[in-house]
């Protein structure tokens, strides 16, 4: 059993990033192997880690166990029996009056995530920072923060007791102003979250709601997203200084969420004690409503105004919600004034989001706004190859090119198609070939081919530029007609399976060289002209529905 685990750990260490290996694999330990039942039990130090490893790595570990013992092995994950002894404080829940109000936007965390009192959170964070900075002053910092924690807990106990039942599901792990400032002052560049104990690292992920798998290392970069990635890295290296706020926009499944999680994960690794929060805009709206109903706005504001990095996803969901927008405006102003970083995503350019207050739009425009475009062919192929590699599947490049050529809209669609191919191949016991891929994706390819036609592209483009559809076929050459016609040709080449001669025929019998010239011209200008790039983005999203 131990020989297997050494073999398994060595393989996983080579396959995963150092951060992933140290965080998820290193804390595991094999505890039993039942040869009669072919069952292997692996212990995890806590429930959070157990659930994550089970969902992400159980299949790979089972495959390695099968190869090692030359038979199917049932891999079971259990809690380390010693875990309870390492955390005695968690055994006795605090009385209701001493529990903190709960965090807005708790997204599936364990039930015990908010079990520590508010001030203890500040003490832990500052103590982590003090230890990472060196032993000098660590004891004093801890003593001072413990005193502050006790005072804060006593001061707020009566007020919170009355509201404890009503605000329990807000889960606000807040600090008072002094604690937040103390935690912020104790940061040192280069302090790594990974150097803390495993329990502390888990707690950071639970509080921040970050997905530790979404990092810069596994983000596939191409022309469509290279500017966004460069801006994200710059912000991760200089939070609150470079590009504040950073506003990323683009269609569904293009990597916006991946990038902002990558920023959060990088900062969490670089600065111990960083107060980071990822939240979807819908959850933020829900928490504003709960805070209003439970009269818990003081806790709500204290929590959000003391963050060091706020990552808010899909802010278009704020549309028409004036109270939410007002609260977010105040939080935004407080964070920027404190040199905290704000990062926002949307499916639309800021000025085109309907129902958003002009004050917020102007704040969004005050930083850096970057579009993420649908991935180009080479990038789509790279995404498929990377995803197949992560699933430990050998994917022929011809198959990847076939899928990438036919599915153009976003990364999620590509990954979903690959999962479908893998399942089809496994179920039928057939090697993954182009023929198998066509069978697996038959319905999806039919829908794709039916969705966008050259005729629809011509009509949509003509409407967008206020010309007649007939102008698409005519021989007229004024700039206000020729330009939209070239754009429509470019979109026809990008969004359909038509050949250049076929496209030329549908544009009034034009030669294929005319179409090729238009495609190359628009593609070149798109990379240099932000306005044209934005117009094409709008047209593509309209055509894809």
Curated annotation (Swiss-Prot):
Residues 209-425 are annotated as: Domain III, AAA+ region. Gene3D superfamilies: 1.10.1750.10, 1.10.8.60, 3.30.300.180, P-loop containing nucleotide triphosphate hydrolases. Its main location: cytoplasm. Residues 72-208 are annotated as: Domain II. GO terms for cellular component: cytoplasm; plasma membrane. Residues 426-545 are annotated as: Domain IV, binds dsDNA. Residues 90-112, 181-204 are annotated as: Disordered. Residues 90-105 have a biased composition (Low complexity). GO terms for molecular function: ATP binding; ATP hydrolysis activity; DNA replication origin binding; lipid binding. Plays an essential role in the initiation and regulation of chromosomal replication. ATP-DnaA binds to the origin of replication (oriC) to initiate formation of the DNA replication initiation complex once per cell cycle. Binds the DnaA box (a 9 base pair repeat at the origin) and separates the double-stranded (ds)DNA. Forms a right-handed helical filament on oriC DNA; dsDNA binds to the exterior of the filament while single-stranded (ss)DNA is stabiized in the filament's interior. PANTHER family: CHROMOSOMAL REPLICATION INITIATOR PROTEIN DNAA. Belongs to the DnaA family. Domain I is involved in oligomerization and binding regulators, domain II is flexibile and of varying length in different bacteria, domain III forms the AAA+ region, while domain IV binds dsDNA. This is Chromosomal replication initiator protein DnaA. The lineage of its organism: Bacteria, Pseudomonadati, Pseudomonadota, Betaproteobacteria, Burkholderiales.
């Amino acid at each position: 059993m131990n020989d297997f685990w050494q073999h398994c750990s060595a393989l996983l260490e080579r396959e995963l990033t150092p951060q992933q290996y140290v965080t998820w694999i290193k804390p595991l330990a094999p505890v039993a192997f039942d040869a009669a039942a072919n069952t292997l039990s692996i212990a995890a130090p806590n429930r959070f880690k157990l659930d994550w490893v089970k969902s992400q790595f159980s299949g790979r570990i089972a495959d390695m166990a099968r190869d090692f013992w030359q038979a199917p092995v049932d891999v079971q994950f259990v809690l380390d029996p010693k875990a309870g002894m390492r955390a005695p404080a968690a055994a006795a829940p605090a009385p209701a009056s001493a529990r903190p109000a709960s965090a807005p936007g708790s997204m599936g965390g364990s039930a015990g995530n908010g079990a520590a009192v508010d001030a203890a959170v500040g003490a832990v964070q500052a103590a982590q920072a003090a230890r990472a900075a060196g032993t000098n002053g660590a004891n004093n910092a801890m003593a001072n923060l413990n005193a502050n924690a006790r005072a804060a807990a006593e001061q707020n106990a009566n007020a919170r007791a009355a509201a404890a039942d009503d605000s329990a599901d807000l889960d606000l792990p807040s600090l008072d102003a002094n604690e937040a400032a103390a935690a912020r002052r104790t940061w040192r560049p280069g302090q790594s979250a990974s150097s803390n104990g495993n329990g502390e690292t888990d707690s950071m992920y639970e509080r921040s709601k970050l997905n530790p798998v979404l990092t810069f290392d596994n983000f596939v970069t191409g022309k469509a997203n290279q500017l966004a990635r460069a801006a994200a890295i710059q912000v991760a290296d200089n939070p609150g200084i470079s590009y504040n706020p950073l506003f990323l926009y683009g269609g569904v499944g293009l990597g916006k969420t991946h990038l902002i999680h990558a920023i959060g994960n990088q900062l969490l690794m670089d600065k111990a004690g960083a107060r980071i929060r990822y939240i979807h805009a819908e959850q933020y709206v829900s928490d504003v409503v709960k805070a209003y109903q439970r009269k818990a706005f003081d806790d709500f504001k204290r929590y959000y105004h003391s963050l060091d990095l706020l990552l808010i996803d899909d802010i278009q969901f704020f549309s028409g919600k004036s109270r939410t927008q007002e609260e977010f405006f105040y939080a935004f102003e407080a964070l920027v004034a404190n040199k905290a970083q704000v990062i926002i995503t949307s499916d639309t350019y800021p000025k085109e989001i309907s129902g958003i207050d002009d004050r917020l739009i102007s704040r969004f425009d005050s930083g850096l706004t970057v579009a993420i475009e649908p991935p180009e062919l080479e990038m789509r192929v790279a995404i498929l190859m990377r995803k197949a590699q992560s699933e430990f599947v050998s994917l022929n490049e011809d198959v990847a090119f076939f899928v990438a050529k036919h599915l153009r809209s976003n990364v999620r669609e590509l990954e979903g198609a690959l999962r479908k191919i893998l399942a089809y191949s496994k179920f039928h016991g057939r090697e993954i070939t182009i023929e198998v891929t066509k069978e697996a994706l038959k319905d999806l390819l039919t829908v794709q081919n039916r969705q966008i036609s050259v005729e629809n592209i011509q009509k949509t483009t003509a409407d967008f530029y206020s010309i007649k559809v007939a102008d698409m076929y005519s021989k007229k050459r004024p700039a206000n007609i020729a330009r939209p016609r070239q754009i429509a040709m470019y979109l026809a080449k990008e969004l359909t399976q038509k050949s250049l001669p076929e496209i030329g025929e549908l544009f009034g019998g034009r030669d294929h060289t005319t179409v090729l010239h238009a495609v190359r011209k628009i593609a070149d200008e798109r990379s240099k002209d932000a306005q044209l790039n934005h117009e094409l983005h709008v047209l593509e999203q309209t055509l894809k529905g």
